């Protein structure tokens, strides 16, 4: 009997991508084949995003496409936390589950298509099924978030912080390293809060016990001999303690910190930490300890009540702090977010657009200036794409998908997943260009 075939669509953030990998790994272990084509598949699973209206619309469009091309659809993910929204538009979907509802998804698949499992065939590699290239992987250390930012509905969709015991995380990391992964990208909703909900539970690891704690996680991952990149790190005071690991090159000198804004007024309205001057002093301290540190962040412009003065404070802050990598979003009202009920004046779309362009122009100048300082240096680069002697890769300063790249010319063919030393010859606003040596 032919194995049942399932088409899979994964939408949204890296956390959702990890959810998709877990579901696919479970399905493959039971004998299901995974396809990228809806036509000819026995059913389609759509892992949705429901954070912004634009993401909800994209999710609904993908459900619509799956129904038209296949007809049998299971919906999971963040949009599934509000099943009525989906049922009102698409009443014929087979099942709807919320985020991280792995077992419910598998049960829904079993109901629609019973598994055909051959116990004599090893269907799944030790590291599980990955949707990223083989040389890097996302390592999700927790679910949910216990913060209550006024613009965000993640706690509603995914619940409060639920950390994985550190021994589980380290076992997964070790398997990935053994499978050939060269870079682990540590992700969660609030990475630096890791373990707080478990009261820093101690668990056995190899010949010792380790605490389920951000510091211990960084220390242990830093001993695995590969690139470790930290994402979604709130600037809590204890983050200071891990900068030393970066200076020692145990983990990459890279911190992804969602600052969101620099105006204390806007930050208070966002229910975010508003001690900007204190954070600035800590950034100065970090850069003294680790001069090679790269900071990446995201910001929101056009938040309700944001004045011209607030926005100018943000631009001045960019000039002062000079974040190496920054992204910017125009504020979108999210259904169910507290920000909708604060009674603050909405910002017109044309004003949001203007502020977004001004932010990006400012950051582009900063990035251009900072990247020029890399010209003439030799950097270790991990190859992401290769066309023989022409390749693209990333240095320690860049995460996949969201940051810049290094364009490489080489005398020999370069392989995806290998490290090469590159002499940087020129730069532009976001990328570097060099020759492999």
From Swiss-Prot:
How the cofactor is bound: the record states: Binds 2 [4Fe-4S] clusters. One cluster is coordinated with 3 cysteines and an exchangeable S-adenosyl-L-methionine.
Cofactor requirement: [4Fe-4S] cluster
Residues of the MTTase N-terminal domain: 4-114
One GO molecular function term of this record is: 4 iron, 4 sulfur cluster binding
User: What is the main EC category here?
Assistant: transferase
Q: Where does [4Fe-4S] cluster 1 bind?
A: 13, 49, 78
Provide the GO biological process annotations.
Answer: tRNA modification
Q: Where is the Radical SAM core domain?
A: 131-369
Catalyzed reactions per annotation: L-aspartate(89)-[ribosomal protein uS12]-hydrogen + (sulfur carrier)-SH + AH2 + 2 S-adenosyl-L-methionine = 3-methylsulfanyl-L-aspartate(89)-[ribosomal protein uS12]-hydrogen + (sulfur carrier)-H + 5'-deoxyadenosine + L-methionine + A + S-adenosyl-L-homocysteine + 2 H(+)
Start and end residues of each TRAM domain: 372-437
Q: What is its EC number?
A: 2.8.4.4
SUPFAM superfamilies the UniProt entry points to: Radical SAM enzymes (SSF102114)
> Which protein family is it in?
Belongs to the methylthiotransferase family. RimO subfamily.
What protein name is recorded for this chain? Ribosomal protein uS12 methylthiotransferase RimO
Species source reads Bartonella henselae (strain ATCC 49882 / DSM 28221 / CCUG 30454 / Houston 1) (Rochalimaea henselae)
């Amino acid at each position: 009997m032919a194995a049942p075939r399932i088409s899979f669509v994964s939408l949204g953030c890296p956390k959702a991508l990890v959810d998709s990998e877990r579901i696919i790994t479970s399905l493959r272990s039971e004998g299901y084949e995974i396809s990228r084509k809806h036509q000819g598949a026995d059913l389609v699973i759509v892992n949705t995003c429901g954070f912004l209206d634009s993401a909800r619309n994209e999710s609904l469009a993908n459900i619509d496409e799956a129904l038209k091309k296949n007809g049998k659809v299971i919906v999971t993910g963040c949009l599934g936390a509000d099943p009525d929204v989906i049922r009102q538009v698409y009443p014929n979907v087979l099942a709807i589950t919320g985020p991280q509802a792995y077992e419910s998804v598998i049960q829904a698949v079993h109901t629609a298509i019973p598994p055909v499992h051959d116990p004599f065939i090893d269907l799944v590699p030790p590291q599980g099924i990955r949707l990223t290239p083989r040389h890097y992987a996302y390592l999700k250390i927790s679910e949910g978030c216990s913060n209550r930012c006024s613009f965000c509905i993640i706690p509603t969709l995914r619940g409060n912080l639920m950390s994985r015991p550190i021994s589980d995380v380290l076992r997964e990391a070790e398997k990935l390293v053994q499978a050939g992964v060269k870079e682990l990208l540590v992700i969660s909703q609030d990475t630096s809060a890791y373990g707080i909900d478990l009261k820093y539970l101690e668990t056995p690891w190899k010949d010792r016990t380790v605490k389920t704690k951000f510091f211990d996680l960084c220390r242990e991952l830093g001993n695995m001999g590969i690139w470790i990149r930290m994402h979604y790190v709130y600037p809590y005071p204890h983050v200071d303690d891990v900068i030393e690991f970066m200076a020692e090159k145990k983990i990459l000198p890279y911190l992804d910190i969602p600052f969101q804004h620099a105006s204390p007024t806007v930050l208070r309205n966002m229910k975010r930490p508003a001690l900007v001057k204190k954070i600035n002093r800590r950034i100065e301290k970090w850069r003294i300890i680790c001069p090679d540190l790269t900071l990446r962040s995201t910001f929101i412009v056009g938040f309700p009540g944001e004045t011209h003065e607030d926005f100018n404070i943000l631009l001045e802050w960019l000039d002062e702090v000079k974040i190496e990598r920054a992204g910017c979003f125009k504020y979108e009202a999210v259904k169910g977010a507290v920000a909708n009920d604060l009674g603050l004046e909405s910002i017109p779309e044309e004003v949001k657009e203007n502020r977004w362009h001004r932010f990006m122009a400012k950051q582009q100048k900063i990035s251009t200036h900072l990247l020029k300082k890399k010209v003439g240096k030799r950097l270790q680069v991990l190859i992401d794409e290769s066309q023989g002697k022409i390749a693209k890769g990333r240095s320690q300063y860049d995460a996949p998908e969201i940051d810049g790249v290094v364009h490489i010319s080489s005398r020999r063919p370069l392989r995806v997943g290998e490290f090469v030393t590159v002499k940087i010859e020129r730069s532009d606003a976001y990328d570097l260009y060099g020759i492999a040596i």
